[in-house]
């Protein structure tokens, strides 16, 4: 089942390139239909009792139901928009227990009568709820590239979203002993049944079980993030799956946190009115008549800045710079081979021998530069610093801006929100990377050279969505993503080695200089 659903991604490429019409052609259409059937069976739109070759009517009805849930035009036809929706990242929990109740509830909302009674029926009729209001939880493991304190902060905040609007209270259980709810990261098949096997990046991000099993599982292969800038936002997915462990099913409201499909972290409240009604229907309003508190999403944009954790028995100076324990926003190197590593509103300078400065505010060196920059590079032609964020660019010569105001990069064809920037010595040009493409800039300006962008496949073995790139004195190019690096042979444009930069690259400043051993 997982492999068949995964083929939808490859089928979509054909569809978007125009090899398939709105209703798939006979040859491609039969294969697409089989993959769509597998998807619809997995998520409960085709009943298990239905024969493996459903009739056209049953298949069309299932497509209609899926289109309605997905806020698509309801046609019953496997068209481009429907197939594209099937490939979007989502929760792995089936929609089976939600569809009929959704239709009933929407009808009630339009009729505007008996609404409260109907809603309560929707959430309580399954009997899947906890019969106590104080619940314990445990974080069993977490992604290696994310700092443990930040992940624990995200978990705590995700539970607090639900306790703020209900009578529930949560506390973290000790490392030993029982816990009502357990949060665990797995890869692939993890003995939950073949239908629940994780499928790598994309597809099903996580799944959970209704009470009172108390389990939520997350795909270890996803590129999890605790910020709004890159990767899948772990906080949003945590909050969604915790909703399932409390007894909530998927919601049809497009703005609901409990909608089946992954939503990005916005600046507004994460819980919709539908989410709040759902949890209150099961557990009641906050105790003592207190008002339900809704926190805006902008408070949860970067959990690593919440980190006040300091392990006992370790001196602060031996813990290494903060970026060593997580990731960074951007990185570059100047003509003296001094590294500049950027994270949030601060930066570090790392000498060639690996000695690291204290973190310094960006505004102390580059006045007017905003926090959380997305890409940085130093031109080895003139030593100027280039910074990129969103659709804007900055150029500094020393501490002084070359341009009075930041420039709009899009005017020259540059991408918005670039992943990384690099001064490439053989071309003596700046290069920007975004997703699966790269852009070569004209010398001394912000114009993209003709015939660009090109595919990242030109850089053999380098992954998409890198977070930084820089040239090394030995002629190699180092690319970074999360906690890993790739070393590229400049002459062959081929990756030769890879590993973990914090423990394997001493010049990154994460090496304990006195002991000569890794910090971790």
Swiss-Prot record:
The precursor is cleaved by a furin endopeptidase. Its EC number is 3.4.24.-. Expressed at high levels in testes and lung. Low levels are detected in kidney, pancreas and skin. Also expressed in fetal lung, brain, skeletal muscle and kidney. Expressed selectively in keratinocytes. Widely expressed in several carcinomas as well. Is up-regulated in response to injury in the skin. Zn(2+) binds at residues 91, 240, 244, 250. Disulfide bonds join 324-510. The active site is at 241. GO terms for molecular function: metalloendopeptidase activity; zinc ion binding. Belongs to the peptidase M10A family. This is Matrix metalloproteinase-28. It comes from Homo sapiens. The lineage of its organism: Eukaryota, Metazoa, Chordata, Craniata, Vertebrata. The gene is MMP28.
């Amino acid at each position: 089942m997982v492999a068949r659903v995964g083929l939808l991604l490859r089928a979509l490429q054909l569809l978007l390139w125009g090899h398939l019409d709105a209703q798939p052609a006979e040859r491609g259409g039969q294969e697409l239909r089989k993959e769509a059937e597998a998807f619809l069976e997995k998520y409960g739109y085709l009943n298990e009792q239905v024969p493996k070759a459903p009739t056209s009517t049953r298949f069309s009805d299932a497509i209609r139901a899926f289109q309605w849930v997905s806020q698509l035009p309801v046609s019953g036809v496997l068209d481009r928009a429907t197939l594209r929706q099937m490939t979007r990242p989502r929760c792995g929990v089936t929609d089976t227990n939600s569809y009929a109740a959704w239709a009933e509830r929407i009808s009630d909302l339009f009729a505007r009568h008996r609404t409260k009674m109907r809603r309560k029926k929707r959430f309580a009729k399954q009997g899947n709820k906890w019969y106590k209001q104080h619940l314990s939880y445990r974080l069993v493991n977490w992604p290696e590239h994310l700092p443990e304190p930040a992940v624990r902060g995200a978990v705590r905040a995700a539970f607090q979203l639900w306790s703020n609007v209900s009578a529930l209270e949560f506390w973290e259980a000790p490392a030993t002993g029982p816990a009502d709810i357990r949060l665990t990261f797995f890869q692939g098949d993890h003995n939950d049944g073949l239908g629940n096997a994780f499928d790598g990046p994309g597809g099903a991000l996580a799944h959970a079980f209704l009470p009172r099993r108390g389990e939520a599982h997350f795909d270890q292969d996803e590129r999890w993030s605790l910020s709004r800038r890159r990767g899948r936002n772990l906080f949003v997915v945590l909050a969604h799956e915790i909703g399932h462990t409390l007894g909530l099913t998927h919601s049809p409201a497009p703005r609901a946190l409990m909608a089946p499909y992954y939503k990005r972290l916005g600046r507004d409240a994460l819980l919709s009115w539908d989410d709040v009604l759902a949890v209150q229907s099961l557990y009641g309003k906050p105790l003592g008549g207190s008002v339900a508190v809704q926190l805006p999403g902008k408070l949860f944009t970067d959990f690593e800045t919440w980190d006040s954790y300091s392990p006992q028995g370790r001196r602060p100076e031996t813990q290494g710079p903060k970026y060593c324990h997580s990731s960074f926003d951007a990185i570059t190197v100047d003509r003296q081979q001094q590294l500049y590593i950027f994270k949030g509103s601060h930066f570090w300078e790392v000498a060639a021998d690996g000695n690291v400065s204290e973190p310094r505010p960006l505004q102390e060196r580059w006045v007017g530069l905003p926090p959380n920059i997305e890409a940085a590079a130093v031109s080895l032609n003139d030593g100027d610093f280039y910074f990129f964020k969103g659709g804007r660019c900055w150029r500094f010569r020393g501490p002084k801006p070359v341009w009075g105001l930041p420039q709009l990069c899009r005017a020259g064809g540059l991408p918005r929100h670039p992943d990384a920037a690099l001064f490439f010595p053989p071309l003596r040009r700046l290069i920007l990377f975004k997703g699966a493409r790269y852009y070569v800039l004209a010398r001394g300006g912000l114009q993209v050279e003709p015939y660009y962008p090109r595919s990242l496949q030109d850089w053999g073995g380098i992954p998409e969505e890198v977070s930084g790139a820089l040239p090394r004195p030995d002629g190699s190019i180092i690319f970074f993503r999360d906690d890993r690096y790739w070393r590229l042979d400049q002459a062959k444009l081929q990756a030769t080695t890879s590993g973990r930069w914090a423990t394997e690259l001493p010049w990154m400043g994460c090496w304990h200089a006195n002991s000569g051993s890794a910090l971790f």
